[in-house]
Amino acid sequence: MKKIKKITALILIAVMIMGGLSACGKNSKEDNPTNGDTATTTTPDNTGDTQETNPYEKTLKFTMSTVDAEKAGLTEAGEPAENFKWLCEKFNVEFEFWPLTWSNYVDQTRMWLNSDSAPDLMMLDVAPTRYSEYLAWVDAGLFREYPDLANYPNMNHRYEKMTTGKMFSVDGKLYAWPAYMDSDQYNYSIATGYTYRKDWAQAVGLFQEDETYTWDEWQTLVKTVIEKDPGNNGAGKTIGIMSKENWAFPKYVAGSISPYMLTFKQGTDGSWVWGPTLPESLEVVKTTKEMYDNGLIWSDQPMVTDNDFANNFNSGKLFAATISNSTVIGLNEIVGSWEDANPDLKPEDCISLAAVEGQDGKLLTWQNADQWSQTAMNHNISDEKAKRWTDMVEFLVSEDGYNFRNFGIQDVDWKYAADGSVECLWPTDADGNQVNPYAYGTWPWARTVGCTDGFELVNPAFPEWMRNLVTRQKDKYADASTTLIPLVAEFSFFTNETYDTAVAGLEAEIYTKVAELMTSSDIEADWTKWVTQKSAEVQPAIDELNANLK
């Protein structure tokens, strides 16, 4: 690894953060190779016989940083959650959680590391754009390496299935455990498409039963809904399409025409080009502009804000919104908000997910990362703590551990059925729906080892109709007939000073420019002019890619 200058302290006084203390007493099927049980070992006594010993006789206390620290290991009533108590007792540990928020976690972690006052275990959440900083931290000796995974079969099994996860090994040593995604059965493909009012599509007679629309069918449907106004908004008041976020436009509207528009593309000869310079990227801009001028796209899309989707969808003005990735949790949030505003309507009769083929007659999507967020150990952590923590991770990524993270305590909250499947034993509410007793306080500590997007699809706490919708959407975009734009880890995490400087904020500049050009009187000329001017600034990045990634 290229030597990076050691980080100097940014502050003079160590930051001391007091979090909630969750104390526990002594310890009284994914396709993983073992169940991860490391609770006992056997050692010979002085007679030559063997006897069981408990490797966790000494109570160890960990400090850990996490978002939602105030919820970690607790119930909504503020009482210790039984699942976390069970875990602490199994490994004879206590945790003090140091609080982070989504707005401060980057800067706060930097402060802790630069002042050598970080907790034992750190939530890093290193995105590719911050990978150079991670390498600098490793080079500065701020993290303790994880032990050889050959001695931890469950961790090794998970690690070997990842590609982006391997980027957190430097010179053959793993310095942060990547929280793996449990969606490998879908090849990590992103299930895009639209959240839309299927009842409106039915009302105008253009609903497709499989809810997969051709490009032309979708354009006609949106136009017809606006014209016929099944929501009774009044002439010209129904919104056809909008994106929920500014960064999703135009990628999830017409991005299938040029899937590399916001990034770089490597040609068959190995050379790299900047996405906006591709001829098909101009076609994306022109097509999006045509849809905008024809009134299919919301007139205020160039100025979209975070609340615009909910306000327009819940009030019955919006027909369809782009989806960056279909999840049960995301759909549940949309439905819950909509249902509050529309108590007389049944959401399962009105809201659904649409898949829209590109102009080539095929669905297209992008491959997602195989991990999200990472947990690093402080370089000052003791050998004993490092071993105990790694043992915990080994259990938590096992089949039993996966079920524990998702369901709770075996034979209390779930059990294996005779056929090996998992039977959920959660209590039911007055409506007969099963209720997750640990929904409040599990994520802050469980996210350290793995994500559970895949579990959502079978989580009985969510309505079956939602789970079925998202499963169908994921099946469509993971199908062999769908064009999948692969994620190449070496490119996604490529970093050096010249490249990082050239691409800083570049993607945002592209989608911001496209939004601005929706009011252009000569969009082809204006787009071409901007791309030509910007290309000179981007060229150093292309040079670095051509020199280092062939």
Give the positions of each predicted feature:
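N-terminal secretory signal peptides that target proteins for export/translocation
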Residues: 1-3
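Helix-loop-helix "hinge/cap" segment bordering the ligand-binding cleft or interdomain interface
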Residues: 173-248, 266-312, 317, 321-324, ...
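Flexible loop/turn segments at secondary-structure boundaries
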Residues: 70-74, 103-107, 128-132, 183-186, ...
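C-terminal motif of bacterial Sec signal peptides marking the signal peptidase cleavage site
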Residues: 19-23
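Ligand-binding "clamshell"
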Residues: 132-147, 173, 332-362
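Conserved N-terminal structural module of periplasmic/extracytoplasmic solute-binding proteins
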Residues: 6-10, 24-217, 252-255, 261-264, ...
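General small-molecule cofactor/ligand-binding pocket signal
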Residues: 94-100, 299-300, 351-354
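Conserved small-residue motifs centered on glycine
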Residues: 66-67, 391-516, 521
